[in-house]
Amino acid sequence: MNLFPIVAGRFKLDGGAMFGVVPKSIWQRTNPADENNLIDLCARCLLIESSDRLILVDTGMGDKQSERFFNYYKPWGGDNLVDSVIGAGFHPNDVTDVLLTHLHFDHCGGCFTWNADRTAFVPVFPNADYWSNESHWQWATQPNPREKASFLKDNLNPIQESGRLRFIEKGKDNPLDLDLLFVDGHTEKQMLPMVDWKGEKLVFMGDLIPVSYTHLTLPTILRV
């Protein structure tokens, strides 16, 4: 098994929204804010290469939303999902499966993009199945007011309409042959892959620990 870190893009969010009750005097030591209190963030994904599958974990924000949307999140840097996959030595057509830790826009937005004349969405990974779990899918498609803005129909509908949406359920075998950790934070039934690699157990933390270093201590971890 081989692992390849993927960067799907970089953007900004309000530091107070990211760290909640943690005082700014603490979090700004590791995540300095700009004049608008925005901190730099990175959409990190993972490619898992096994003997018969190439699994992409999460897809970042994507590029199909409106200019107003992207003005809010202020993308920066030159990184993007497809270039990062190619940089790892693969082509988007090589990806067999896309495992979505959860369905917030910054984790599943890169599954689809516009076609050439911007009249329809097309898959970025045309040979891939999309994996979620039924509990989280229901949570995303019937969202509560708190999370509604994070679950975008332009992301979810194309996945469902593709006919390639698959569900993995807790405690049941799955075709991906991955151990999965199901957590109710920071959204319902987030699904985190665990991989045995070089004698270690690695866990892709998704948004359970969205910011390295700063979100590692118990008081700073997002709601579980």
Q: Where in the sequence are the language-model features?
A:
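Active-site metal-binding loops of divalent metal-dependent hydrolases
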Residues: G9, T59-G62, L103, S135-H136, ...
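Metal-dependent phosphodiesterase/nuclease catalytic metal-binding core
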Residues: L47, D179-L181, M191-Y213
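Metallo-beta-lactamase
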Residues: W76-F90, D94-D106, F121-F182
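Metal-dependent catalytic neighborhoods of phosphoester/phosphodiester hydrolases
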Residues: G109-T119
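Conserved small/polar residues in nucleotide/adenosyl-binding loops
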Residues: T214-T220
